[in-house]
């Protein structure tokens, strides 16, 4: 879906890593949340509270998921899941547009 209808967008930005990652929170009528954001090239480690699905809309990154020593290349049109209460690392190779869905 390229468009969300009847949602609330939080005006203030979520800024991480000195502006290397910036997103906006979108709240749906049922209370679920997503963030829409941009990542600049760089390496970032995120911690999760809830499980997440990260959809990469455009761009390219190398990804290391919890419990893995391997890096996987992820590009536009691909997605990955991250369990709750874990961390994952991304080496962003080019400007990357993403949508993160918070589950549970």
Swiss-Prot record:
Enzyme class: transferase
Keyword Glycosyltransferase carried by entry: yes
Any one GO CC term of the record: cytosol
Family in the record: Belongs to the nucleoside phosphorylase PpnP family.
Spans through the membrane: none
GO molecular function, one term: purine-nucleoside phosphorylase activity
SUPFAM superfamilies reported for this sequence: RmlC-like cupins
The enzyme's E.C. designation: 2.4.2.1, 2.4.2.2
Cited InterPro entries: Ppnp, RmlC-like_jellyroll, RmlC_Cupin_sf
Reactions the enzyme catalyzes: a purine D-ribonucleoside + phosphate = a purine nucleobase + alpha-D-ribose 1-phosphate; adenosine + phosphate = alpha-D-ribose 1-phosphate + adenine; cytidine + phosphate = cytosine + alpha-D-ribose 1-phosphate; guanosine + phosphate = alpha-D-ribose 1-phosphate + guanine
Superkingdom, taxonomy of origin: Bacteria
Protein function: Catalyzes the phosphorolysis of diverse nucleosides, yielding D-ribose 1-phosphate and the respective free bases. Can use uridine, adenosine, guanosine, cytidine, thymidine, inosine and xanthosine as substrates. Also catalyzes the reverse reactions.
Protein name stated in the entry: Pyrimidine/purine nucleoside phosphorylase
Keywords from the named record: Glycosyltransferase, Transferase
